[in-house]
Amino acid sequence: MLRTTILATTLAVTFASAEAATPLQVKVYNADGNSFNVNSTLVYGEKEAMVIDAGFTRADALRIAANVLDSGKQLKTILVSQADPDYYFGVEALSANAPRTPVLPKALNGNSLTVDGQVVELRGNQGLLAHRPYFWIPSIKAIVGNIGVFGNLHVWTADTQTVAERSAWIAQLDEMAALQPKIVVPGHMKSGTAVDISAITYTKAYLLSFEKNAAATKTSAELIDAMKKAYPDAPPGLSLDIGAKVNKGEMKW
């Protein structure tokens, strides 16, 4: 786990929609480095709420549950967007605070859900990275629940070990940017990161830099050093260390 002194924070952003009588609101819980800086998003309207991703620890889940209680809305769904532990380990503690709330996926039927009648669309579930989808909320032009967007951190590359996979990742980022989102909630982010399109730009630039430096270096140590120099403000940790070792063939993942 990443060890930092960053405190878990909650960010609240509200965007109006011309089409919706009551625009959806988005509240982001940003865990600290002990939970890999993973995000959980509460989406709520006039009456209903949905939690996208349940946090990594019990403490994370309880803080997310507090956000739900503070909203005063009925929690309709707990949606787990990714198959990584930091997205679902908190489900049990979170659902214990909302025992009537269904948890998805058991399996998500179709490609959309709703919050107070406003659509939350599943996207990016085709092609090489079909197992890494994201969710698009058109009424507020928001992208949430995606493992492929990072904010001011070293990007996790251990799960994309080929040039083809990383190229598909960049293509997905371009697809997201083409939606011209007003809100972008990274899967993981450094405290204080803006939840907007700049996170997509950051992640794409990082991947291109990683590709260039991977080709120019012989060992993981050299690659790690190059990426630290390219991103001096990104906290050090397992993401870069493991990603470099895996992509240099020094470690199996």
PLM regions and their residue ranges:
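Conserved beta-strand hairpin/beta-sheet module of binuclear metal-dependent hydrolase folds
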Residues: 21-75, 134-137, 141-147
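Soluble non-cytosolic domains of exported or imported proteins
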Residues: 37, 55-62, 85, 107, ...
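Metallo-beta-lactamase
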Residues: 56-57, 96-201, 205-209
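Active-site metal-binding motif and surrounding structural segment of the metallo-beta-lactamase
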Residues: 59-97
